[in-house]
């Protein structure tokens, strides 16, 4: 119903407002208002308004007050109804076309029946006329047309053909009428209409002229009409089922029907024309057509008269024109389908399992990383990977996907995740998971994130039940995809990992090896022990199991977490790192000895393989004891053990579990309290040092005498190391200004009052202070310099882990941000609350900028990959500038530890490229061999990566892929990196082993020592070794080398203060555990070991000196050495001159020529080490051992990775009692060691 305003009639205009026209009915409602209008009432004013409205706008006749309007009346006509039924309606038109197709096939079948029933020998003539016989004379070229014009047609067959022709004719005329658009001639001269008239109109004429009933009518041409009807029917069918991707199917169908119609037309045409010639039957004509179309013909069957010969020529010409066009169209569609990838069928999606990978552009490195990591898990072998990418597949990807290993399991679809049609093609709603990756090589990374966000929204809208795994680049965009099941923010993880690299060396290597799937078989065929041990330990990964179902941990139910961790490692070689309560979703790393294990707990542990795939071989205790004694007498090294023995034979370590107290040595005033102090046994040195047992239940009196909450009070009573500097007050709290939404709150060391923005500038003084260089600040710890292009929000995550509350105040290193562009106020507002954080504008390729930011006073320099150089015209050239700049810095500052981020992991080989170094060439061959063996970690033996000096964020892509099987990996990684802080969860730190700590002997005894004294869980070792390499171009087996400890090469120079040439202890928690050295007389074992190392080194040196005669090669080496020394002196003078020019003091600069073994260790990244130490080409290498076997020998300068329990874990339960007990113990605690763990 609708209302319309009608003009007033003349009578209505004359009538008064209260009058009613004659003959009109009284209105049903007052004032004639529609019931749809709101009523107005309540007072005279409302009534007057209502009447005025009625008089002006609704003064209608009561009979016309409501008007019913009908819509789409144009479709109610007879023609429109017919058009709707025959053409517009999908289902009805499909039925009509199916009927028409069947009708055409029936006419062709009736023609074949007429040919089979026809017998020319019975006579030829019109219906009702006299018949005569005709015989063809093969010797004469003349023939009669009568056998061609007249055929024999039975009466019943004629009736059926007439009826079918009449129906077809009427249908054709009706469709012509319905589809008429103003041009009748275009429809009349259409090929389909002409064929219809040829095949139907003669039959209708024979009804009115009987003699023509035997007239030949080429009914077999209806096959082409049937083909046309079939095409229309398939189109209607696809439209009815809403199938849009049907072009390929249609083209194949058209090609097949065209071939069939050509053969059928040729067969029937030649058979009929040869009635006047050789009188061929249908089968012979069909054989002739097939032979003629497929070959040049055999000549056994040939047409006899010229009309049939002419027909053959015409058919061949048509075939040569039509078929190539059809094939061209088919090939084009096939190529397009190869590009787009076709469809993933619904049947496969329901019967098979598949995951979808959505990317902006697919590169070969990204593809292989995903496939290798995804299919590394045994239970994913039956999964299919459907790649949905808007760009065309490049040549390298196409070549890889043609390999049988991947072609059977990977399907590439070209399409957009924003289109529901493409998501339907990928069957996203049936997928097991959807991985959405950002394009990190884009110049505008924010735009790349925006595309990722839209893809995630589109997938969530289309398939809300499909698990989402999203990779995001910028941390400020993370909250847009918070709904995803798993999210990895690239910049968050990158900056946090680079920060931990400065205080826990090679954290990047540790995390990378943990998140890669490996069986620990890399390097096992290498002749070098470090490669075998490093490769085997790289197979350790994080696994989980319910404690009640575990053979590893079931026996420790009701015991403390620390007790279970130690004994599981001792017995099975597994490292228990954390757990999760059944009623709590939070994962806790090392919850401490107060945590009692329950059967419902989920345990997370590090091992070569998961427990379900492990076999247990239990041996008799006597054999274990004997083997343990033999292991003490002769150390064969962990590399002698097979891979499975790490699990099967972990109970072979002899541990002295006597219940003795561990007391710090009372030697020097610096005291030993911060290291693994050697306990004394009543003054007797005959007994082997013992370690206290790990208690089943925590003893509160024996645990951490002072937690880190007392750090504030410690600082108040601790005298300053430098009397000229005042003690700066820090507070613990949460940063007040987060630079982006979604950052995890972390308790940090903060300034009591925010620093003014002017004070954050390192190289410029202000009204608050006049410092203009790092020397003037007088920092006690070495600097950490970060070189970045812009101060993005991700850089905030570099600062937070280094200022976390669990870091000791005395271990905080000053942080200098060397930025190409000036930071905005929003970023400065976020960092102004942190202590000792400064910025400076400059570039890493400018020597003046490096000197002004205090690079000569820095221990660590982090070079972050620049966004503007992440994309290059030539692949893998994006890192060229970064690599060259880092090379230059290593030449200028050899003692500096530089961590470099690269865009492409394959470029890390240039970080230590030496063309004539045989050892580097051998490592390159080893990498190629591992890659051929299918290893996911082929790059692991590159020395810069093994040492943790180079990192690429693409290495962490596997973290997202591994989360499909291990949904806890992202959470554990963020806890290790300090990005998330869960109450009660521990944190990652490091401890350095010195010669005074070697009484521990083995890693298993160290595990017990740490668990019993400070409840810390070691998870690995960072080891640095000195090697002497031969310069001869032999392989690794022929290389002459020795392995000694760094302490044998170290200069015995004393510490010269914070800016001295060599400090006794470096900055950061890495070196925070060792203090002054104890008397070597107390350690005869250490003296003997040092003498053995010295003799081995001297013997090796004397052998090489004796084998080096005065030859031309030796003279060349000497000249080269002199040349390099002069080069180093030149570089040293260059740096000093620039410092003088800038007005910087040169007293802190260390001469490049005076290299020590520590310098060599720090320069393992780049390899300018040949001929720099001595004539024996000494070099160093560093590597990470994850969860080594308990009988692994400790070496000096080993750095042990620890998971330390949260010092705030139990504060809420007994805060008052802890506060009083800590205050009572402050006087008894050594003030220099309170922040470290008492061991």
From Swiss-Prot:
Changing residue 409 to Q: Generates currents that resembles wild-type in terms of voltage dependence and kinetic behavior but has 2- to 3-fold higher amplitude compared to wild-type. GO terms for cellular component: plasma membrane; postsynaptic density membrane. It is a multi-pass membrane protein. Pfam families: BK_channel_a, Ion_trans_2, Slo-like_RCK. Residues 127-153, 209-215, 275-281, 303-304 are extracellular. Residues 352-488, 781-921 form the RCK N-terminal domain. Residues 1-93, 179-192, 234-246, 339-1239 are cytoplasmic. InterPro entries: K_chnl_BK_asu, K_chnl_dom, K_chnl_Slo-like, RCK_N. Na(+) 2 binds at residues 761, 764, 771, 779. Zn(2+) binds at residues 758-759, 766, 768. Belongs to the potassium channel family. Calcium-activated (TC 1.A.1.3) subfamily. KCa4.1/KCNT1 sub-subfamily. This is Potassium channel subfamily T member 1.
């Amino acid at each position: 119903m609708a209302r319309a305003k009608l003009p007033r009639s003349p009578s209505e205009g004359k009538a008064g407002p209260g009058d009613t026209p004659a003959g009109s009915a009284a209105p049903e409602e007052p004032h004639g208002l529609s019931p749809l209008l709101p009523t107005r009432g309540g007072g005279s004013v409302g009534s007057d308004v209502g009447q005025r409205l009625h008089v002006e706008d609704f003064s209608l006749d009561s009979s016309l007050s409501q008007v019913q309007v009908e819509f789409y009346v144009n479709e109610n006509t007879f023609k429109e109804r017919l058009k709707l039924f025959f053409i517009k309606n999908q289902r009805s038109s499909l039925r009509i076309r199916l009927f028409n197709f069947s009708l055409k096939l029936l006419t062709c079948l009736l023609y074949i029946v007429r040919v089979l029933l026809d017998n020319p020998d019975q006579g030829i003539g019109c219906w009702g006329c006299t018949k005569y016989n005709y015989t063809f004379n093969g010797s004469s070229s003349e023939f009669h047309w009568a056998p061609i014009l007249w055929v024999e047609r039975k009466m019943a067959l004629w009736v059926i053909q007439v009826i079918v022709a009449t129906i077809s004719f009427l249908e054709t005329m009706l469709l012509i009428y319905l589809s008429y658009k103003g041009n009748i001639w275009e429809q009349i001269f259409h090929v389909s209409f002409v064929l219809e008239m040829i095949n139907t109109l003669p039959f209708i004429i024979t009804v009115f002229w009987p003699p023509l009933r035997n007239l030949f009518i080429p009914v077999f041409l209806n096959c082409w009409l049937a083909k046309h009807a079939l095409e229309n029917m398939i189109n209607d069918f696809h439209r009815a089922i809403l199938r849009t991707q049907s072009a390929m199917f249609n083209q194949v169908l058209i090609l097949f029907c065209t071939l069939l119609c050509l053969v059928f037309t040729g067969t029937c045409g030649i058979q009929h024309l040869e009635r006047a010639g050789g009188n061929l039957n249908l089968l012979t004509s069909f054989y002739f057509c097939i032979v003629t179309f497929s070959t040049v013909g055999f000549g056994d069957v040939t047409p006899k008269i010229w009309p049939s010969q002419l027909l053959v020529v015409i058919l061949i010409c048509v075939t040569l024109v039509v078929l190539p066009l059809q094939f061209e169209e088919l090939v084009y569609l096939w190529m397009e389908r190869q590009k787009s990838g076709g469809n993933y069928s619904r049947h496969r999606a329901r019967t098979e399992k598949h995951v979808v990978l959505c990317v902006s552009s697919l590169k070969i490195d990204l593809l292989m990383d995903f496939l290798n990591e995804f299919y590394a898990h045994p239970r994913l072998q039956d999964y299919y990977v459907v790649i949905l990418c808007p760009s065309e597949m490049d040549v390298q990807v196409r070549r890889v996907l043609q390999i049988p290993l991947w072609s059977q399991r990977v399907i590439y679809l070209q399409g957009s995740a924003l289109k529901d049609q493409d998501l339907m093609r990928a069957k996203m709603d049936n997928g097991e998971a959807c991985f959405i990756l950002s394009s990190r090589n884009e110049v505008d990374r924010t735009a790349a994130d925006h595309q990722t966000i839209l893809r995630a929204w589109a997938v969530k809208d289309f398939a809300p039940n499909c698990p989402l795994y999203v990779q995001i680049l910028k941390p400020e965009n993370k909250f847009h995809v918070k709904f995803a099941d798993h999210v990895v923010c690239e910049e968050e993880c990158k900056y946090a990992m680079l920060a931990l690299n400065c205080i826990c060396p090679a954290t990047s290597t540790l995390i990378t090896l943990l998140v890669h799937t490996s069986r620990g078989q890399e390097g096992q065929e290498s002749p070098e022990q470090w490669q075998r041990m490093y490769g085997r330990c790289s197979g350790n990964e994080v696994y989980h199991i319910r404690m009640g179902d575990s053979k590893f941990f079931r026996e420790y139910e009701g015991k403390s977490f620390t007790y279970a961790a130690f004994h599981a490692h001792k017995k099975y070689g597994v490292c228990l790192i954390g757990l999760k309560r059944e009623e709590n979703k939070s994962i806790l790393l090392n919850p401490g000895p107060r945590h009692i294990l329950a059967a419902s707990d989920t345990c997370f542990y590090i091992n070569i393989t998961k427990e379900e795939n492990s076999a247990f071989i239990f041996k008799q205790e006597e054999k274990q004891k004997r083997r343990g004694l033999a292991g003490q007498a002769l150390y064969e090294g962990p590399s002698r053990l097979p891979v499975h023995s790490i699990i099967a034979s972990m109970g072979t370590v002899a541990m002295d579990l006597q219940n003795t107290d561990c007391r710090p040595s009372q030697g020097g005033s610096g005291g030993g309290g911060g290291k693994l102090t050697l306990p004394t046994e009543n003054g007797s040195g005959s007994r082997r040092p013992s370690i206290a047992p790990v208690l089943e239940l925590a003893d509160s009196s024996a645990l951490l005498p002072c937690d880190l909450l007392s750090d504030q009070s410690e600082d108040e009573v601790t005298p300053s190391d430098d009397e000229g500097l005042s003690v700066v007050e820090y507070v613990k709290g949460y940063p007040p200004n987060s630079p982006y939404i979604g950052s995890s709150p972390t308790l940090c060391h903060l300034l009591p009052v925010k620093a003014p923005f002017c004070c954050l500038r390192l190289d410029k003084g202000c009204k608050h202070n006049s410092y203009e260089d790092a020397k003037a600040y007088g920092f006690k710890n070495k600097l950490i310099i970060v070189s970045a292009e812009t101060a993005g929000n991700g850089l905030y995550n570099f600062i937070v882990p280094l200022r976390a509350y669990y870091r000791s105040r005395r271990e905080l290193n000053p942080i200098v941000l060397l930025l190409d562009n000036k930071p905005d106020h929003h970023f400065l507002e976020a960092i102004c609350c942190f202590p000792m954080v400064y910025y400076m504008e400059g570039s890493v390729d400018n020597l003046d900028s490096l000197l002004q930011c205090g690079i000569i006073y820095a221990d660590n320099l982090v070079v972050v990959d620049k966004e503007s150089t992440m994309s290059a015209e030539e692949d893998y050239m994006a890192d060229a500038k970064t690599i060259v700049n880092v090379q230059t810095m290593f030449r200028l500052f050899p003692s500096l530890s530089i961590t470099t981020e690269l865009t492409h992991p394959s470029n890390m080989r240039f970080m230590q490229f030496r063309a004539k170094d045989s050892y580097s060439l051998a490592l390159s061959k080893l990498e190629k061999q591992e890659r051929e063996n299918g290893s996911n970690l082929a790059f692991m033996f590159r020395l810069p990566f093994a040492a943790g000096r180079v990192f690429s964020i693409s290495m962490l892509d596997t973290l997202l892929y591994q989360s499909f099987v291990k949904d806890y990996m992202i959470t554990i990684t963020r806890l290790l990196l300090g990005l998330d802080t869960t109450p009660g969860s521990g944190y990652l730190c490091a401890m350095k082993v010195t010669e005074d700590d070697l009484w521990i002997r083995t890693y298993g005894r160290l595990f017990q020592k740490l668990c019993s004294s400070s409840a810390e869980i070691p998870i690995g070792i960072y080891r640095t070794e000195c090697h002497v390499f031969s310069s001869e171009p032999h392989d690794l087996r022929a290389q002459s080398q020795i392995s000694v400890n760094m302490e044998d090469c170290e200069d015995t120079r004393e510490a010269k203060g914070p800016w001295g040439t060599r400090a006794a202890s470096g900055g950061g928690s890495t070196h925070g555990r060792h203090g002054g050295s104890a008397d070597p007389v107390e350690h005869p074992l250490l003296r003997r070991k040092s003498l053995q190392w010295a003799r081995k080194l001297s013997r090796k040196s004397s052998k090489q000196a004796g084998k080096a005669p005065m030859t031309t090669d030796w003279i060349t080496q000497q000249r080269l050495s002199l040349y390099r020394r002069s080069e180093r002196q030149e570089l040293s003078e260059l740096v000093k001159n620039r410092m003088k020019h800038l007005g910087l003091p040169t007293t802190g600069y260390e001469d490049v020529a005076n290299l020590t073994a520590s310098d060599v260790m720090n320069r393992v990244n780049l390899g300018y080490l040949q001929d720099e130490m001595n004539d024996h080409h000494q070099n160093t290498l560093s590597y990470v051992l994850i969860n080594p076997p308990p009988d692994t020998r400790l070496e000096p300068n080993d750095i042990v990775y620890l998971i330390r329990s949260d010092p705030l874990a139990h504060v809420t339960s007994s805060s008052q009692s802890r506060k009083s007990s800590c205050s009572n113990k402050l006087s008894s605690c050594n003030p220099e060691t309170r922040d470290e763990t008492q061991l």
